[in-house]
Amino acid sequence: LARITSYTTIQAVYIEQPFLFFKSGGSSAATMAVLQKFNGVVSWVCYNLFDIEPQYLRAQEARKLCGIKVPRGQKAKKVVMDFILDNVPDFDVVYTRQGNPRPGYADRADSYVVAKAGLTRENQETKDSN
């Protein structure tokens, strides 16, 4: 992240807001606690590096800002990955022998969606203030 500041000016930081509730088939309390800690560290690092208070987007809000609709009964991760593969030409995915994306690629796709949603929100706010 520090290297980025050498060639560009960061004006906003958007981070995916972690889940705040349990749902059937979701992450365990331990996993959610680790994600909360990780988000806290990332928020702190971004604030210290860029002197910008991060803004948080729920995953559903980020998908909506990007125009991604998850039909009832479908897995959001798959819908997001399909959207990214269809719309981001330089997004490459490595697959397992079973044809699933290797671990980490769904997270990369989610990160792209949050970043794109943040940019969309910034552009909307700029347009609204003019």
What are these regions (language model features)?
Residues L1-N130:
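Phosphate- and other anionic-substrate recognition elements at nucleic-acid/protein interfaces
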